[in-house]
């Protein structure tokens, strides 16, 4: 096969390589608490299998990535890093010559290079390795010493009776040992301390804690060490182990855990003194967080610190008030969470204290609800939550631990009993949902009863899985007897964006309705900003991650993950690999994708997967390296990088040292480059940006005078045009004559001359006077000849529903009037202002006062109002009657949407990426199961799609669109509009709201509507979760810090709604981007802020309803 190369290579000449190519940088910044920011603090990753002397071997730490540093510093100033991997000239050579450096140097310059750079890096590595491994070895020696067991020590070997000896290899120039990867640390089984060991009673004096590192402890006095390992080990050495783990940020409170072992709290009980060791839950949290880091040096959590030896905080002791030291001690909360307004969860997460005992699982482990008191008329759940007794035995897990569904009496004629004793409604049996934990409600069910299709083998699959190109039936029967329009394209044949295969899209009736010349062409230009500096310029979709468009790729998890991972320097060619799967190269001759070579994928995964593991993330499952061809294949071409391929993407800032940091870190007040170059020249002018006078915010020049204010005082939209005295300035800074303003005809290209022409103003009696603007002046309307149909037109034009009251109010002397044209009924005008003309008098001297009633919205007559569950679950019909499904043929469901009026729907703009033709879309209402038609279902075609003009695919900002339906919906209990907020109505942080949609639950999209309750998170806190995106006031963050429920329960365009007093529900957000469904560490979802866009939404509806026909005419 042919390998694509972007430069001429000479494979016979190799440059010497070292473990830190050209440099070893260090960063003393403590890694941030979030997962993506934590990656930045890891520094550089090492070369697997490379020994200090350059020989090919298993690696000094026996892992695929190891800790290293450039130089040794005194204790307290040590800087840990992951060494950067080598930049091989040709990846192919890596397998033939191994990962080690060549034995012979070609030139004296290379020798000098090794002496000055390689040796300090290796020395620093050895020091850290020695500390970690010597600690493990010390644990072993101390344990046998404390248990009167003497190991036999020889040169390089430690022999323990009954234990296979472990060889320790020493370098000649150092005393640092290395453990081969095939061997593991033996498990010692010392005597477990008895309960008395954990709370030693004696009469010794309590001592003050003087060790500087342990001043973080929430107590000040201690006893002599209690654990044998601490007694028989140097204290500095013991604490240094936890200090290094702390700097690796594997667990927020790891240093506190180590200090609580070294200095147990001294508790006075009369004449006795006893010390408290950490609680078992504290130990388990520390072990869970840091064991993966220890695994990177082929070690494990020390058996001498096994958690089973510690007491559980729930254990009681009649003579001791506290049995162990817990993170949840009242006097320790303030210092551990950084303030008295926070609560410390058992997991170590800090949440606002006001969230404690509020009935919500904010900690993800219910510890914020664990010690709450319930009133007598409420049921106390096992999780600590308080419930009304009416919620017991109703089939819903309201408690979160099923404690409200235990010991229930089932009516077997109407209910089904699950294996755990829970009772569920009989209609839930065989409906395709696993309502029972043991899934007994879906046993022996026909596929049809679940709304599914039966394979020949009897397996059930959704109907949309038929003829989709994937064999979902184990016997492959779902891909048999497929028509040509459904058959996936054979290799080498051009295909549309959908699934049909054609020779050309132009004029072909075989093309799917959502295909076009642009997306059916062989190649398309790369527009994904992240990959704009590739050696190729065209791509072909779908990509290797399953994204169908570049827009879908830009908002994917991988588009945020890979740039953040690049910062760790785990692999020089990681960004190149990421782009080859996000925007695959398109062969201009064949129109086919060119995949990356398998070796490139394998190297990327081997060197960077362990870094993800440290922060609890996994390598993207769709990047299975076996799907890519070997370089030596004869029948397929694959991609390998040039030596000079650019490591930093356009979304990164390149430090002077060459390191890549995210562009969002540029000029953020914190030095991310090792040379601080990212914090230099940070003024707006120095960066060729425009500066807002009020807050010194920097704006791109393309945002100045574009019709949308960006500065807080709107100064970026001032002095943008020079209109004459007889002209007025449009919102887009065009000039229009005054006498054309609010005349019922569109003169500004953005229609702004006809905005807000009809309003209601209050007078002294609190009546709402009808006011109409003509020629930029306000006028009251004379009541002479007024009809009720005009009141209806006025209320409708203002988007205020039907008129409920029309009054005639006495006018004032000398005011200016607008009167109806004598023949107004024959004018066929669509707006009120074009039916009125200026007059000096009004014979009746009466003016119009209106009271418009908003349409009834946000009601759920068919919902079971008291059924709510944290953590997300399948919803029931009628609970969310405004939820709709935006669909196209043949793809089916694409996005969620929200009904806001009988003919109007909201969704996000990115759903229409590359598919803005209204003819290919339809909207389905009143449906819960996408694969099962409902008797309440209504379908409408799309008439108009209106994307926000400021929508940006690069930053996913202004992500909103208004959709006009072909016909009004029929309002029922299952199809009803939601309320819109007022422009001034914003959500307070820590408000709880609901998200709904057909989101992602596992590998495939669920076909039942999902719902989940989420908490509103402040924007400043939200920004800390997302390095690659900027959180603006046009966005809302919602979810939980723990990631339990986020918008993976919903899908793009789906609603975020909050209940208001009176039982009405208001739409505050549309699911936009942010959440990662299979990770609990990346934080909340991000939603378009509907309150910000209410004015724009109402304006679009007004323009389409009243002005569009006139402007087209």
UniProtKB/Swiss-Prot annotation:
Its EC number is 3.4.21.-. Residues 758-853 form the SRCR domain. It is an enzyme of class 3 (hydrolase). It is found in: Cell membrane. Highly expressed in heart. Also expressed in pregnant uterus. SUPFAM superfamilies: Frizzled cysteine-rich domain, LDL receptor-like module, SRCR-like, Trypsin-like serine proteases. Residues 869-1102 form the Peptidase S1 domain. Residues 336-372, 373-408, 409-445, 446-483, 647-682, 683-721, 722-757 form the LDL-receptor class A domain. The keyword S-adenosyl-L-methionine does not apply. Residues 1-112 are cytoplasmic. Glycans are attached at residues 147, 202, 208, 298, 317, 373, 411, 444, 481, 519, 537, 635, 719, 765, 828, 970, 1089. The chain crosses the membrane at residues 113-133. It is a single-pass type II membrane protein. One of its GO terms (molecular function) is serine-type endopeptidase activity. Residues 176-202 are annotated as: Disordered. Keywords: Cell membrane, Disulfide bond, Glycoprotein, Hydrolase, Membrane, Protease, Repeat, Secreted, Serine protease, Signal-anchor, Transmembrane, Transmembrane helix, Zymogen. Serine-type endopeptidase involved in atrial natriuretic peptide (NPPA) processing. Converts through proteolytic cleavage the non-functional propeptide NPPA into the active hormone, thereby regulating blood pressure in heart and promoting natriuresis, diuresis and vasodilation. Proteolytic cleavage of pro-NPPA also plays a role in female pregnancy by promoting trophoblast invasion and spiral artery remodeling in uterus. Also acts as a regulator of sodium reabsorption in kidney. May also process pro-NPPB the B-type natriuretic peptide. This is Atrial natriuretic peptide-converting enzyme. It comes from Mus musculus. The gene is Corin.
């Amino acid at each position: 096969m042919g390998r694509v190369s972007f430069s001429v290579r000479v494979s016979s000449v190799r440059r010497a390589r070292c473990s830190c190519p050209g440099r070893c940088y260090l960063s003393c910044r403590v890694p941030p608490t979030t997962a993506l920011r934590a990656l930045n603090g890891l520094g550089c990753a090492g070369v697997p299998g490379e020994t200090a002397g350059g020989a090919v071997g298993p690696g000094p730490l026996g892992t695929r990535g190891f800790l290293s540093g450039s130089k040794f510093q005194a204790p307290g100033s040590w800087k840990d890093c992951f060494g950067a991997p080598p930049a091989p000239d040709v990846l192919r050579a890596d397998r033939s010559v191994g990962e080690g450096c060549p034995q012979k140097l070609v030139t004296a310059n290379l020798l000098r290079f090794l002496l000055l750079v390689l040796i300090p890096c290796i020395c620093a590595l050895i020091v850290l390795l020695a500390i970690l491994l010597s600690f493990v070895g010390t644990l072993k020696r101390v344990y046998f010493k404390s248990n009167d067991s003497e190991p036999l020590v020889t040169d390089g070997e430690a022999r323990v009776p009954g234990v296979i000896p472990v060889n320790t290899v020493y370098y000649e120039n150092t005393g640092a040992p290395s453990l081969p990867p095939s061997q593991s640390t033996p498990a010692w089984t010392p005597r477990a301390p008895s309960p008395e060991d954990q709370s030693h009673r004696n009469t010794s004096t309590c001592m003050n804690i003087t060790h500087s590192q342990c001043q973080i402890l929430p107590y000040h006095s201690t006893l002599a060490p209690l654990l044998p390992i601490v007694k028989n080990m140097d204290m500095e050495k013991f604490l240094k182990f936890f200090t290094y783990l702390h700097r690796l940020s594997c667990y927020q409170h790891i240093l506190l855990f180590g200090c609580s072992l070294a200095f147990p709290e001294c508790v006075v009980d009369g004449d006795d003194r006893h010390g408290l060791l950490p609680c078992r839950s504290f130990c388990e949290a520390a072990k869970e967080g840091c064991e993966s880091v220890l695994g990177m040096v082929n070690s494990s959590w020390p058996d001498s610190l096994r958690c089973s030896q510690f007491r559980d905080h729930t254990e009681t002791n009649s003579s001791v008030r506290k049995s162990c030291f817990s993170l949840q001690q009242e006097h320790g909360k303030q210092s551990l969470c950084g303030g008295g307004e926070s609560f410390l969860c058992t997991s170590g997460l800090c949440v606002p204290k006001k969230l404690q005992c509020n009935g919500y699982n904010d900690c993800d482990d219910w510890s914020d609800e664990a010690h709450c008191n319930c009133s007598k008329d409420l049921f106390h759940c096992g999780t600590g939550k308080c419930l009304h007794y009416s919620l017991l035995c109703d089939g819903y897990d309201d408690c979160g631990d099923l404690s409200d569904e235990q010991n229930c009496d089932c009516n077997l004629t109407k209910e089904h009993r699950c294996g755990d004793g829970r009772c569920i409604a009989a209609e839930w049996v065989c409906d395709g949902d696993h309502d029972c934990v043991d899934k007994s409600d879906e046993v022996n069910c026909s596929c049809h009863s679940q709304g599914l299709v039966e394979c020949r083998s009897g397996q059930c699959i959704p109907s949309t899985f038929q003829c989709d190109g994937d064999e979902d039936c184990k016997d492959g029967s779902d891909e048999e007897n497929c028509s040509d329009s459904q058959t996936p394209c054979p290799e080498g044949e051009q295909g549309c964006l959908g699934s049909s295969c054609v020779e050309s899209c132009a004029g072909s009736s075989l093309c799917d309705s959502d295909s076009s010349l642009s997306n059916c062409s062989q190649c398309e230009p790369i527009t994904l900003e992240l990959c704009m500096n590739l050696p190729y310029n065209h791509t072909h979709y779908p990509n290797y991650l399953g994204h169908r468009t570049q827009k879908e790729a830009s908002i994917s998890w991988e588009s945020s993950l890979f740039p953040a991972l690049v910062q760790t320097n785990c692999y020089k060619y990681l960004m190149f690999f990421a782009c080859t799967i996000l925007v695959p190269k398109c062969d201009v001759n064949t129109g086919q994708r060119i995949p990356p070579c398998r070796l490139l994928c394998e190297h990327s995964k081997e060197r960077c997967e362990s870094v993800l593991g440290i922060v609890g993330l996994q390598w993207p499952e769709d990047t299975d390296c076996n799907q890519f061809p070997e370089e030596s294949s004869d029948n397929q071409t694959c991609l390998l990088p040039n030596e000079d391929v650019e490591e930093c993407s356009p979304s990164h800032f390149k430090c002077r040292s060459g390191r890549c940091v995210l562009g969002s870190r540029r000029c953020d007040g914190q030095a991310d480059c090792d040379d601080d170059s990212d914090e230099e020249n940070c003024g707006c002018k120095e960066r060729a940006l425009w500066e807002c006078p009020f807050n010194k915010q920097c704006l791109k020049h393309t945002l100045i005078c574009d019709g949308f204010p960006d500065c807080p005082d709107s100064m970026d939209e001032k002095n943008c045009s020079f209109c004459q005295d007889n002209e007025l300035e449009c919102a887009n800074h065009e000039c229009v004559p005054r006498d054309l303003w609010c005349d019922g005809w569109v003169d500004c290209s953005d229609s702004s001359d006809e905005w807000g022409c009809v309003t209601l103003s209050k007078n002294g009696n609190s009546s709402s006077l009808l006011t109409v603007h003509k020629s930029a002046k306000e006028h009251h309307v004379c009541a002479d000849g007024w009809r009720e149909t005009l009141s209806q037109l006025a209320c409708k034009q203002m988007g205020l529903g039907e008129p409920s009251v029309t009054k005639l109010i006495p006018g004032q002397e000398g005011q200016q009037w607008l009167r109806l044209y004598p023949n107004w009924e024959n004018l066929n005008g669509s707006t009120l202002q074009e039916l009125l003309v200026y007059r000096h008098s009004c014979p009746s001297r009466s003016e119009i006062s209106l009271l418009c009633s908003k349409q009834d919205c946000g009601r759920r007559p068919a919902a079971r109002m008291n059924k709510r569950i944290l953590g997300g679950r399948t919803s029931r019909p009628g609970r969310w009657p405004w939820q709709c499904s935006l669909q196209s043929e043949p793809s089916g469901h694409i996005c969620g949407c929200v009904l806001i009026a009988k003919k109007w729907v909201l969704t996000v703009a990115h759903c229409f990426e590359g598919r803005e033709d209204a003819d290919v879309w339809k909207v389905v209402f009143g449906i819960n199961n996408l694969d099962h038609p409902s008797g309440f279902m209504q379908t409408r075609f799309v008439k108009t799609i209106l994307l926000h003009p400021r929508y940006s695919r690069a930053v996913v900002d202004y992500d909103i669109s208004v959709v006009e339906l072909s016909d009004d919906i029929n309002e029922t209990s299952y199809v009803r509009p939601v309320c819109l907020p007022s422009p001034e109505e914003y959500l307070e942080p820590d408000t709880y709201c609901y998200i709904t949609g057909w989101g992602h639950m596992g590998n495939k999209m669920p076909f039942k509507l999902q719902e989940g309750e989420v908490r509103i998170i402040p924007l400043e806190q939200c920004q800390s979760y997302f390095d690659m995106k900027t959180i603006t006031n046009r966005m809302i963050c919602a979810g939980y810090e723990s990631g339990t429920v986020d918008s993976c329960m919903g899908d793009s365009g789906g609603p975020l709604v909050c209940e208001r007093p009176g039982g009405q529900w208001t739409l505050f957000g549309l699911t936009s981007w942010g959440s990662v469904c299979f990770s609990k560490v990346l934080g909340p979802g991000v939603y378009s802020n509907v309150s910000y866009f209410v004015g724009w939404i109402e304006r679009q509806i007004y323009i389409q309803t009243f002005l569009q026909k006139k402007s087209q005419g």
